């Protein structure tokens, strides 16, 4: 399907359910209804998996992108009685930056976006409406119950695969210090949020969001970045990228738009997103001053924070750790400061020779965050942009500052996670995790990869997924995906899918290594289907059924090939699984155990060996000519 390029194309976003799948729901209390995806196997089994796609893969759901998604949380928010609606700030043309367009198409999108926007809501005077604030007061919110049900999933189908005590003991994970429960309870979720070890990013102005948790003691999550640039992409294309990203497994999405119509793009994305949305507010603030970093002011930035909080952004990347005293530490780096936000603020600090205004106004930022329940994603503006800059003084000086700011945020009960690198060779990854836990008090870590090598342009999603799997196992709570276009250009729809699949692999590998309950059951179901040559089930249990089916059908396209007990790799005579099945069939026919059958085979082979030796051990036996 081509990316949409007209307003009406927003009515036909990607809606197809996955093959052999349907949306199912686990019910809780107070209207808690958690969606999951059920995969029907050809042997009658039902496998249920975590689902990030929202209502888009539910054929029974009615979706009109011009109206936005239905609310999940409005009733919960209103029932708490600690918020109020208000008129909100007046939208101005500058909100869409200095490069906004005035074409008829954009004006139509902008007008429709104005209708999309809900009446903003905020905490009542002097109030605090964060999930951390509730958690620290012993309140279990519906959002926390939702998370517990979602993390558990439906486990009945797993019993067949997890019942072998010897196997489970042999394959037990190493949690690397994490404390992962066998069963998630709402009380466990509350305690993790209260301690700051987990966050539930859920702005009160984003009632459409399906609550999820980011934390070391939960399943490893992934984030996908979308957003336009000054040179490419449209609003319609970015909304389709959002839907496409969550289809393939993005738990969160960041809108990193830096080009035209930033405000309008964000309206469309937030209102149509069932997953938390993050932004980097400094990008829009920079657009408001015409792209001149030194013209940024606290007043402009503060106004931008409120604007985005009213729209419903769930977490802000804020580069408050890029401090004036640290900038000189980057002077001898091979690649300097590679973070866009970090470089903007470094330039501002050097130009004015003043401390970063995000650092000096941090407590004021906390006041805004707690009025809307926007979570901090404390940005790593001094992250290494190459392997040779990894783990240097600048990176770790900033990390220590982020730990200090975390405690300030927690003083205000503001949920906080910490962003991390970047480019880190494999042997230095553990040190990154150790330093983060040490200085940031177990706040969730959120890393970009890291990329383990620098020589893979076009394949950086692979180079980084290696590092992502490692650091996910070590304790990182969320992995920010990298696409094949990293360092090369703005990713398109296919790049987004490739990046997400690479990172779903990394996150799942980390969950298995950590011993996350039930993580391996889907793999066992796949292995069983593979051994039994149930080709359709193999496709449908995979992370990407479409590609798996296409690859198989390139060489064996006929329907009859889906029943064959071989593939094109080995053919019918050399398939190891077919040979093993033949041994088992022989054993069953003879009334033997599999071990006895193998012993029979070995005995027969020994007899043939003895016969060969008795004949002289010659490979070629002379043949006496027949006399005429």
Curated annotation (Swiss-Prot):
<feature type="binding site">
    <location>
        <position position="319"/>
    </location>
    <ligand>
        <name>substrate</name>
    </ligand>
</feature>
<dbReference type="InterPro" id="IPR037509">
    <property type="entry name" value="ThiC"/>
</dbReference>
<feature type="binding site">
    <location>
        <position position="567"/>
    </location>
    <ligand>
        <name>[4Fe-4S] cluster</name>
    </ligand>
</feature>
<keyword id="KW-0862">Zinc</keyword>
<feature type="binding site">
    <location>
        <position position="423"/>
    </location>
    <ligand>
        <name>Zn(2+)</name>
    </ligand>
</feature>
<keyword id="KW-0408">Iron</keyword>
<dbReference type="Pfam" id="PF13667">
    <property type="entry name" value="ThiC-associated"/>
</dbReference>
<comment type="similarity">
    <text>Belongs to the ThiC family.</text>
</comment>
<dbReference type="InterPro" id="IPR025747">
    <property type="entry name" value="ThiC-associated_dom"/>
</dbReference>
<dbReference type="GO" id="GO:0008270">
    <property type="term" value="F:zinc ion binding"/>
</dbReference>
<keyword id="KW-0456">Lyase</keyword>
<feature type="binding site">
    <location>
        <position position="575"/>
    </location>
    <ligand>
        <name>[4Fe-4S] cluster</name>
    </ligand>
</feature>
<feature type="binding site">
    <location>
        <position position="283"/>
    </location>
    <ligand>
        <name>substrate</name>
    </ligand>
</feature>
<keyword id="KW-0784">Thiamine biosynthesis</keyword>
<feature type="binding site">
    <location>
        <begin position="380"/>
        <end position="383"/>
    </location>
    <ligand>
        <name>substrate</name>
    </ligand>
</feature>
<comment type="subunit">
    <text>Homodimer.</text>
</comment>
<feature type="binding site">
    <location>
        <begin position="339"/>
        <end position="341"/>
    </location>
    <ligand>
        <name>substrate</name>
    </ligand>
</feature>
<feature type="binding site">
    <location>
        <position position="570"/>
    </location>
    <ligand>
        <name>[4Fe-4S] cluster</name>
    </ligand>
</feature>
<feature type="binding site">
    <location>
        <position position="254"/>
    </location>
    <ligand>
        <name>substrate</name>
    </ligand>
</feature>
<protein>
    <recommendedName>
        <fullName>Phosphomethylpyrimidine synthase</fullName>
        <ecNumber>4.1.99.17</ecNumber>
    </recommendedName>
</protein>
<dbReference type="GO" id="GO:0009228">
    <property type="term" value="P:thiamine biosynthetic process"/>
</dbReference>
<keyword id="KW-0479">Metal-binding</keyword>
<dbReference type="Pfam" id="PF01964">
    <property type="entry name" value="ThiC_Rad_SAM"/>
</dbReference>
<feature type="binding site">
    <location>
        <position position="446"/>
    </location>
    <ligand>
        <name>substrate</name>
    </ligand>
</feature>
<dbReference type="GO" id="GO:0051539">
    <property type="term" value="F:4 iron, 4 sulfur cluster binding"/>
</dbReference>
<keyword id="KW-0411">Iron-sulfur</keyword>
<feature type="binding site">
    <location>
        <position position="487"/>
    </location>
    <ligand>
        <name>Zn(2+)</name>
    </ligand>
</feature>
<feature type="binding site">
    <location>
        <position position="225"/>
    </location>
    <ligand>
        <name>substrate</name>
    </ligand>
</feature>
<feature type="binding site">
    <location>
        <position position="419"/>
    </location>
    <ligand>
        <name>substrate</name>
    </ligand>
</feature>
<dbReference type="GO" id="GO:0005829">
    <property type="term" value="C:cytosol"/>
</dbReference>
<comment type="function">
    <text>Catalyzes the synthesis of the hydroxymethylpyrimidine phosphate (HMP-P) moiety of thiamine from aminoimidazole ribotide (AIR) in a radical S-adenosyl-L-methionine (SAM)-dependent reaction.</text>
</comment>
<comment type="pathway">
    <text>Cofactor biosynthesis; thiamine diphosphate biosynthesis.</text>
</comment>
<dbReference type="InterPro" id="IPR002817">
    <property type="entry name" value="ThiC/BzaA/B"/>
</dbReference>
<dbReference type="GO" id="GO:0009229">
    <property type="term" value="P:thiamine diphosphate biosynthetic process"/>
</dbReference>
<keyword id="KW-0004">4Fe-4S</keyword>
<keyword id="KW-0949">S-adenosyl-L-methionine</keyword>
<dbReference type="GO" id="GO:0016830">
    <property type="term" value="F:carbon-carbon lyase activity"/>
</dbReference>
<dbReference type="InterPro" id="IPR038521">
    <property type="entry name" value="ThiC/Bza_core_dom"/>
</dbReference>
């Amino acid at each position: 399907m081509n990316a949409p390029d007209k307003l009406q194309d927003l009515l036909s976003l990607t809606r197809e359910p996955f093959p052999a799948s349907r949306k199912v729901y686990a019910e809780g209390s107070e209207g808690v209804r958690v969606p999951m995806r059920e995969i029907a196997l050809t042997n009658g089994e039902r496998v249920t998996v975590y689902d990030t796609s929202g209502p888009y893969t539910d054929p029974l759901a009615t979706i009109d992108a011009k109206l936005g998604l239905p609310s999940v949380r409005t009733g919960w928010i209103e029932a708490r009685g600690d918020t109020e609606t208000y008129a909100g700030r007046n939208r101005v043309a500058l909100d869409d930056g200095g490069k906004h367009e005035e074409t008829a198409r954009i004006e139509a999108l902008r007008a429709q976006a104005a209708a999309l926007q809900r009446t903003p809501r905020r905490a009542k005077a002097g109030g605090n409406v964060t999930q951390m604030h509730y958690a620290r007061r012993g309140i279990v919110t519906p959002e926390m119950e939702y998370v517990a049900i979602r993390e558990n999933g439906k486990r009945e189908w797993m019993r067949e695969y997890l019942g072998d005590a010897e196997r489970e003991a042999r394959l037990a994970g190493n949690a690397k210090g994490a404390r992962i429960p066998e069963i998630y309870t709402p009380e466990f979720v509350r305690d993790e949020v209260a301690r700051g070890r987990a966050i539930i990013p859920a702005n009160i102005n984003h009632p459409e969001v399906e609550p999820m948790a980011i934390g070391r003691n939960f399943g490893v999550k992934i984030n996908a970045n979308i957003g336009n640039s000054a040179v490419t992409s449209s609003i319609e294309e970015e909304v389709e990228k959002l839907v496409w990203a969550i289809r393939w497994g993005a738990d969160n999405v960041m809108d990193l738009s830096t080009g035209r119509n930033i405000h309008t793009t964000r309206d469309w994305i937030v209102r149509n997103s069932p997953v938390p949305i993050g932004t980097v507010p400094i990008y829009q603030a920079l657009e408001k001053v015409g792209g001149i970093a030194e013209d940024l002011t606290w007043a402009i930035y503060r106004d931008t924070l409120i604007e985005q909080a009213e729209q419903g952004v769930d977490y802000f990347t804020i580069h408050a750790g890029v401090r004036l005293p640290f900038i000189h530490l980057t002077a001898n780096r091979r690649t300097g400061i590679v973070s866009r936000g970090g470089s903007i603020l470094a330039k501002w600090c050097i130009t004015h020779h003043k401390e970063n205004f995000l650092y000096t106004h941090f407590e004021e930022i906390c006041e805004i965050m707690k009025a809307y329940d926007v979570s901090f994603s404390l940005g790593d503006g001094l992250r290494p942009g190459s392997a040779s800059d990894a783990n240097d003084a600048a990176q770790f000086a900033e990390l220590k500052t982020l730990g200090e700011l975390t405690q300030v945020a927690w003083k205000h009960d503001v949920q906080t996670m910490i962003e991390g690198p970047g480019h880190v060779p494999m042997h230095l990854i553990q040190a990154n995790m150790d330093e983060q836990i040490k200085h940031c008090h177990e706040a969730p870590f959120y890393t970009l990869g890291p990329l383990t090598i620098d020589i893979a342009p076009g394949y950086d999603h692979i180079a980084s997924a290696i590092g992502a799997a490692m650091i996910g196992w070590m304790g990182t709570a969320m992995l920010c995906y990298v696409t094949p276009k990293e360092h090369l250009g703005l990713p398109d729809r296919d790049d987004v899918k490739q990046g997400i699949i690479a990172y779903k692999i990394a996150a799942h590998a980390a969950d298995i290594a950590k011993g996350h309950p039930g993580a391996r059951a889907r793999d066992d179901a796949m292995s069983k289907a593979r051994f039994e040559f149930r080709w359709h089930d193999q496709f449908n249990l995979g992370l990407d059924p479409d590609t798996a089916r296409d690859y198989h059908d390139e060489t064996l396209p006929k329907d009859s090939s889906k029943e064959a007990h071989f593939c094109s790799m080995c053919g019918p005579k050399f398939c190891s699984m077919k040979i093993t099945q033949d041994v088992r069939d022989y054993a069953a026919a003879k009334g033997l155990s599999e071990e006895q059958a193998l012993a029979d085979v070995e005995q027969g082979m020994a007899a043939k060996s003895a016969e060969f030796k008795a004949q002289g051990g010659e490979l070629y036996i002379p043949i006496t000519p027949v006399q005429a």
